[in-house]
C-alpha cells in the first residue's frame, strides 16, 4: 500500500465566516484525513486543524498520524556562505543596519516595517551614527493588479519617508527589487535588526537563515503571526500585534537591549536552528516510513 504524506502543512488559525471558504477547507481537510501522516509547521496549525475537523467533519475519522515537524534550513550550506561572503552593502562598520526581506505580498506587512523604522529614526536623539533600512523585495504574482499596485505603493512609501527624514542628509530607506539571493544573504550576515513582521506567515525561513548567517549579534523583530516564532520566539523581540504601533514598540524594545542580552539571544537562535536543521526535519520524515513499515 502506498504511503501518503502531507508535509510542511499550514492551517488557518481562525475559521472564516465565508461559506465558500469553509467548503474549500472542508474539501482540503477531507483529503488530508485520508493520508497516513500529516506534518504541520507548528503546534497551533495542528490544533487548528484538529478543531476544524472535529467541528466540520464530524462523521469522518482518520487513522493517520498528526505531528509537528517544521521545515528548516541547511546550516552547513549557510555557514559556507559566511566563509565566502563579500562586503558590498554600502555600510560602514558604525552604521546601524535594519533589514527586511520579503516577497511583495500583503501578508509580509512591508509597509508597516517601513513606517515603523521611520518612526523610530524620526523620534531618536540626533546622532552621528547613521541608521539604514534595506528592503529586499522579490516581486510576486505580478500578473495580478493588486500585487502590482502593492509594489508601487511600497516604492511610494519609501520615497515619502525618505522625504520626511531628509534632515538626516542621507536617504535612510533603500529598496532593492529582484530575486538577488546573494545580496540578501550579505544583508543577513550584516544586520543589526531583522524585521519580519508578517500579518500571517506559515513559517518564514528568512528568520532561520538570518539566525545562522548573522555575525553581529543581530536581533530579530517579529510577530506572533510568524510560524517560526513558535520555535524561536523566546530568542526574538515579538510584537504584540502586526500593527505599526506594536512593531514600532518592538523596534524600540530591541534598540534598548544591552550587548549581553543581544549576544545570548543570538547564540540561542544559532543553537536551536543548528540542532533542528533541515537534516533533522528529513530524518523525522524518514522515521515515519520505518514506523509505517511495521504496521
Give the predicted meaning of each segment.
Residues 278-295:
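C-terminal alpha-helical cap of glycosyltransferases
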Residues 7-10, 70-71, 225:
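Histidine-centered beta-alpha loop that forms part of the nucleotide-sugar donor binding/catalytic region
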Residues 1-13, 31, 37-40:
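Active-site proximal beta-strand in glycosyltransferases
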Residues 180-192:
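Short acidic alpha-helix that forms the nucleotide-activated donor recognition element
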Residues 22-38, 268:
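Membrane-proximal helix-turn-helix segments that form the acceptor-binding/catalytic region
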Residues 33-68, 73-85:
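A short, active-site helix/loop in glycosyltransferases that binds the activated sugar's phosphate group
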Residues 126-132, 189, 193-275, 284:
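Catalytic binding pocket for nucleotide-activated donors in carbohydrate/polymer assembly enzymes
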Residues 67-180:
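Conserved catalytic-core segment of nucleotide-activated headgroup transferases in glycan assembly
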Amino acid at each position: 500500500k502506498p504511503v501518503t504524506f502531507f508535509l510542511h502543512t499550514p492551517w488557518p488559525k481562525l475559521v472564516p465566516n465565508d461559506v465558500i471558504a469553509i467548503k474549500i477547507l472542508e474539501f482540503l481537510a477531507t483529503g488530508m484525513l485520508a493520508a497516513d501522516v500529516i506534518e504541520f509547521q507548528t503546534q497551533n496549525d495542528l490544533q487548528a486543524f484538529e478543531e476544524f475537523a472535529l467541528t466540520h467533519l464530524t462523521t469522518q475519522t482518520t487513522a493517520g498520524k498528526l505531528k509537528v515537524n517544521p521545515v528548516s534550513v541547511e546550516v552547513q550550506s549557510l555557514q559556507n556562505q559566511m566563509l565566502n561572503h563579500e562586503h558590498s552593502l554600502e555600510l560602514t562598520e558604525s552604521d546601524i543596519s535594519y533589514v527586511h526581506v520579503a516577497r511583495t505580498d500583503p501578508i509580509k506587512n512591508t509597509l508597516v516595517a517601513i513606517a515603523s523604522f521611520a518612526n523610530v529614526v524620526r523620534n531618536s536623539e540626533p546622532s552621528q551614527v547613521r541608521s539604514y533600512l534595506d528592503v529586499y523585495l522579490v516581486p510576486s504574482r505580478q500578473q495580478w493588479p493588486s500585487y502590482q499596485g502593492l509594489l508601487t505603493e511600497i516604492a511610494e512609501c519609501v520615497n515619502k519617508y525618505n522625504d520626511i527624514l531628509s534632515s538626516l542628509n542621507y536617504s535612510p530607506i533603500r529598496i532593492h527589487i529582484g530575486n538577488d539571493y546573494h545580496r540578501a544573504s550579505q544583508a543577513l550576515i550584516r544586520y543589526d535588526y531583522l524585521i519580519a513582521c508578517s500579518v500571517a506567515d506559515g513559517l518564514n525561513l528568512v528568520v532561520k537563515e538570518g539566525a545562522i548567517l548573522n555575525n553581529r549579534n543581530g536581533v530579530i523583530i517579529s510577530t506572533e503571526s510568524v510560524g517560526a516564532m513558535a520555535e524561536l520566539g523566546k530568542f526574538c523581540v515579538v510584537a504584540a500585534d502586526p500593527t505599526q504601533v506594536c512593531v514600532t514598540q518592538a523596534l524600540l524594545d530591541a534598540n534598548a537591549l544591552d550587548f549581553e542580552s543581544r549576544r545570548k539571544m543570538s547564540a540561542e537562535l544559532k543553537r536551536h536552528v543548528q540542532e533542528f536543521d533541515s537534516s533533522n526535519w528529513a530524518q523525522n520524515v524518514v522515521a515515519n516510513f520505518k514506523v509505517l513499515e511495521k504496521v
